[in-house]
Amino acid sequence: MNGTVNSEDLKGKVVLINIFATWCGPCQSELAEVQKTLWPKYKDNKDFCMLVIGREHTDNQLTEYNKRKGFTFPLYPDPKREVTGKFASQYIPRSYLIDKDGKVISATVGYKKEEMDKLMKEIDKALK
């Protein structure tokens, strides 16, 4: 949906990677909360990047999905599980928060609404 991502583009940034599937109920709940609370807060921060990756989905599938859901953040396809096969081979949703030095500072599996506040506090801390 938004091209490719180069690791050079992510250097020095706080990066949130979220792996989801359109058929996954908890993923739908999590992405709705991301759209409502997280994305509006961080979308304009030049030191933050969010990669929402659709496991086993094509660009066309994600475009159609986004039309139905109305998300304003980019969705990235991974139809052959080249990325998601390494980081979320089984359970989703899965999220990784990476600090400006490229270190994973948080990793979660599944979704609970109360975890969103914790994640946002971790993002705030990493952005300082």
PLM regions and their residue ranges:
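A short beta-strand-turn-helix
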Residues: M1-V15
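Conserved Rossmann-like nucleotide-binding pocket used by diverse enzymes
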Residues: N6, F20, L51
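Conserved helix-turn-beta segment immediately C-terminal to the redox Cys motif
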Residues: K13-V14, S29-I53, K67
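Short pre-active-site segment immediately N-terminal to redox-active cysteine/selenocysteine motifs
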Residues: K13-V15, F20-W23, Y91
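Solvent-exposed loop/turn segments at secondary-structure junctions
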Residues: A21-P26, E56-N60, R81-V83
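Thiol-based oxidoreductase modules, predominantly thioredoxin-like and allied folds used
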Residues: K46-D59, F71-K80
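Thiol/disulfide oxidoreductase modules built on the thioredoxin-like
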Residues: E64-F71, D78-D124
